[in-house]
């Protein structure tokens, strides 16, 4: 099973725009197995964007479940994430899944953790993966000192900085936005 724990995914809400991006590197242990993986997915006809880190098969299982919850709860992202987290914590099969998700829409950024937690950041930035602290630090600085940048530009530059520092993050980026 392909595990993409060593990756970087970031979402930024800034100036009425939301962007999410990820690098394209997949590793198994200390070996790069692919350099152009797309870790960003669109749900609800692009109204919800998601990014994942962890085991690929596990992430797709969770994305499918999250999509089902979004359909069931009429696109209410936070409610859908909480219901997914409840399932994640109580379902014996789901508890063994090794993945983390970021979900964004026009109003919200959410981190859905591997322990079934749903976290809404208060600074408009959420990151996961091995390069997440580098990307988050860059995004915090850019939001503070370059407020004229768009959310997409902040995501791009933050991922580029993370790729320069983290050996498990490359600069083959996928970025999507919601305005």
Swiss-Prot record:
CDD domains associated with the record: protease_HslV
Keywords: Allosteric enzyme, Cytoplasm, Hydrolase, Metal-binding, Protease, Sodium, Threonine protease
Mechanisms controlling activity: Allosterically activated by HslU binding.
Main localisation: cytoplasm
Active site per database record: 7
InterPro entries listed in its UniProt record: ATP-dep_Prtase_HsIV_su (IPR022281), Ntn_hydrolases_N (IPR029055), Proteasome_sua/b (IPR001353), Proteasome_suB-type (IPR023333)
Pfam families membership: Proteasome (PF00227)
Taxonomy, superkingdom: Bacteria
This enzyme's EC code(s): 3.4.25.2
Name by which UniProt lists this protein: ATP-dependent protease subunit HslV
Source organism of this protein record: Amoebophilus asiaticus (strain 5a2)
Gene from which this protein is expressed: hslV
């Amino acid at each position: 099973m392909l595990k993409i724990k060593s990756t970087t995914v970031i979402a930024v809400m800034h100036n009425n725009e939301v962007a999410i991006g990820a690098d394209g590197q997949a590793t198994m242990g200390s070996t790069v197995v692919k350099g152009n993986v797309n870790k960003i997915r669109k749900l609800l006809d692009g109204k919800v964007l998601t990014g994942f880190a962890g085991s690929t098969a596990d992430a797709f299982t969770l994305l499918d479940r999250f999509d089902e919850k979004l359909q069931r709860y009429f696109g209410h992202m936070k409610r859908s994430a909480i219901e997914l987290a409840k399932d994640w914590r109580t379902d014996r099969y789901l508890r063994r899944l090794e993945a983390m998700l970021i979900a964004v829409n026009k109003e919200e950024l959410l981190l859905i953790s591997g322990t079934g937690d749903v976290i809404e950041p208060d600074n408009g930035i959420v990151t996961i993966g091995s390069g997440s602290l580098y990307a988050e630090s860059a995004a915090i600085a850019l939001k503070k000192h370059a407020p004229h940048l768009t959310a997409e530009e902040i995501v791009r530059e933050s991922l580029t900085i993370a790729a320069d520092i983290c050996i498990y993050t490359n600069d083959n980026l996928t970025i999507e936005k919601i305005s």
